[in-house]
């Protein structure tokens, strides 16, 4: 993954030198001041004008930082899956994903998943769409929604 750093830096430089892109994204998709439940880059970009331009640069900064970490300490080892046998019980886990926090709760009965609940940032961010698009031109509405980086797979889960 660390080999991607030069290409990413070239992209960041190119985007920074594109005034048309900045003028198109700046001031578009500003989040409502009463927005709650934000997480991930959408929340962290809120202190950066909270618009589509700020969210783009927040994501680029986070990708750059992640590649810097990988370069400094190496790629992470993937966990080894183990056989849990026929165990039963409940569990919860939270993890920071590229789109924000995800929380998983599940129940096992005799080694089989009986119920689960997956709560992702996209499920919270989808609630912003109506506020971001109301009264906007179509192009601005599309930019606003696109800047939220919604995953259709997470929204419908």
Where are these regions (language model features)?
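Active-site bordering "gate/hinge" segments
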Residues: 1-157
């Amino acid at each position: 993954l660390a080999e991607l750093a030069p290409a990413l830096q070239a992209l960041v430089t190119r985007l920074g030198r594109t005034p048309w892109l900045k003028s198109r994204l700046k001031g578009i998709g500003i989040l409502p001041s009463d927005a709650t439940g934000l997480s991930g880059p959408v929340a962290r970009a809120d202190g950066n004008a909270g618009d589509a331009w700020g969210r783009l640069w927040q994501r680029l900064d986070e990708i750059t930082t992640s590649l810097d970490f990988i370069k400094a300490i190496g790629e992470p080892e993937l966990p080894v899956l183990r056989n849990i046998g026929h165990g039963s019980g409940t569990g919860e886990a939270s993890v920071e994903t590229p789109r924000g926090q995800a929380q998983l709760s599940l129940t096992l009965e005799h080694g089989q998943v009986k119920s689960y609940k997956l709560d992702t940032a996209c499920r919270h961010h989808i609630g912003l769409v109506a506020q971001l698009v109301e009264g906007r031109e179509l192009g601005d509405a599309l930019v606003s929604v696109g800047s939220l980086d919604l995953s259709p797979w997470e929204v419908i889960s």
